[in-house]
Design a protein with these regions (language model features):
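Cell-envelope/extracellular polymer assembly enzymes that use nucleotide-activated donors
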Residues: 10-12, 41
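Glycine-rich, basic loop-to-helix element that forms the pyrophosphate-binding segment
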Residues: 72-90
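Active-site beta-to-alpha loop of glycosyltransferases that engages the nucleotide-sugar donor
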Residues: 15-26, 48
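Conserved donor NDP-sugar-binding/catalytic core segment of glycosyltransferases
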Residues: 106-133
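A conserved acidic beta->alpha catalytic loop
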Residues: 46-55, 74
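Acidic donor-diphosphate engagement hotspot in glycosyltransferases and nucleotidyltransferases
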Residues: 53, 81-82, 109-114
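Short, acidic, metal-binding catalytic loop of nucleotide-sugar glycosyltransferases
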Residues: 30-39
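Short beta-strand-to-loop acidic/aromatic patch adjacent to the donor-nucleotide binding site
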Residues: 94-106
Length: 133
C-alpha cells in the first residue's frame, strides 16, 4: 500500500509583518531559497503597519509567485494576525502544512520539507514546534 506522504504536500508559511520591511524581506528570501524545490506558499500578514511598509510589500511582491500579502485594516495583534494568515493558507491556498512564524525568523534548514514530511509520517502530529537554541 502506498503511503499518503508519497503525494507532494504543499507548505504554507504565515509571516506576521509590522513595520520592519527589511526583516520581512530577508525572511521571505530565506523561505524562497530553502523551499525552491518544494510546493510552497508564503502569506505575509501586514498588521496595519503605520509606516506604509505593508503597502510597500504588497507592491514589491505583487507579481511574485508563491507570495501573497494580506493588508489588515487594523492591528489584530499577534494571535488574530496569524489566524488571518493561517485561514487564508488553509482555505484559499489549500496548504497541507502551515508554519506560523515571525518576520525575524530565517529558515536555515535545507531539507525542511523532507524533515516535516518524515516527522508527520512517523507521528501524525497536529502541531509541531521547532528546536530553539
Amino acid at each position: 500500500m502506498e503511503s499518503k506522504m508519497s503525494e507532494k504536500k504543499k507548505f504554507g508559511f504565515v509571516v506576521l509583518h509590522y513595520c520592519t520591511l527589511d526583516m520581512t524581506k530577508k525572511c521571505i528570501a530565506a523561505i524562497q531559497e530553502k523551499m525552491a524545490q518544494a510546493d510552497y506558499e508564503i502569506v505575509v500578514v501586514d498588521n496595519a503597519s503605520g509606516n506604509g511598509t505593508g503597502k510597500d510589500l504588497a507592491e514589491c511582491y505583487k507579481d511574485t509567485e508563491h507570495v501573497s500579502v494580506l493588508l489588515s485594516k487594523e492591528n489584530l495583534g499577534f494571535a488574530k494576525g496569524n489566524n488571518l494568515g493561517y485561514v487564508y493558507a488553509r482555505e484559499d491556498l489549500h496548504c497541507d502544512f502551515i508554519c506560523v512564524m515571525n518576520n525575524d525568523v530565517i529558515l536555515l534548514q535545507d531539507n525542511f520539507a523532507q524533515l516535516v514530511e518524515a516527522a508527520y509520517e512517523a507521528h501524525q502530529f497536529a502541531v509541531m514546534g521547532p528546536h530553539i537554541e
